[in-house]
Curated annotation (Swiss-Prot):
It catalyses: Preferential cleavage: Tyr-|-Xaa, Trp-|-Xaa, Phe-|-Xaa, Leu-|-Xaa. It is an enzyme of class 3 (hydrolase). SMART domains: Tryp_SPc (SM00020). GO terms for molecular function: serine-type endopeptidase activity. Keywords: Digestion, Disulfide bond, Hydrolase, Protease, Secreted, Serine protease, Zymogen. Residues 16-243 form the Peptidase S1 domain. Belongs to the peptidase S1 family. This is Chymotrypsinogen B. One of its GO terms (biological process) is digestion. It comes from Bos taurus (Bovine). The active site is at residues 57, 102, 195.
Amino acid sequence: CGVPAIQPVLSGLARIVNGEDAVPGSWPWQVSLQDSTGFHFCGGSLISEDWVVTAAHCGVTTSDVVVAGEFDQGLETEDTQVLKIGKVFKNPKFSILTVRNDITLLKLATPAQFSETVSAVCLPSADEDFPAGMLCATTGWGKTKYNALKTPDKLQQATLPIVSNTDCRKYWGSRVTDVMICAGASGVSSCMGDSGGPLVCQKNGAWTLAGIVSWGSSTCSTSTPAVYARVTALMPWVQETLAAN
């Protein structure tokens, strides 16, 4: 897991406001969650052939689909996999009011076929550390300006630093809890439509899922950290759910 066949190229600190187009296929775990009309509403990450992790607040149902192997949503010619969702496992501790425990696991009805452009991200162990200042990456088809009418066609990426929860609370106060991890305030920001997608950090050469795009500034301010679900804190529930299903 976590080693793309097509290497990503990050130009350092490039939403994904102020992001840049990704190299096609270089974030092979990134999926698009689309409703029955083909509208992209959230991102997600493949963690195996059968499972996708996304944000609980995305409100995914079994009538939505997971699209894997996509880069340009404006192209009909891409070799994408449109995968039906068999079952939705929303974290029972998720609260829409506090946005805590913002994680949902999707069991695919038919497994994804792994290829050069479709593969899994690594999950962290529950005790893994992603220290403040560590440079990580986030990807998505979210808005590139908060007031944009539509989302970009091409997958966007940005490099951004982890922000400690203590520093993050300087912006957000007590809303930031230990089931969250912050990143950004560095000239880039996740934005609407990126939700559910990955915040990944490279550990020993493999990209590992540190966060799930959860919430942040309503104007996608690039000087304010965005808040992600902290995957390490949610790993006990993830392991339990995968083991039981």
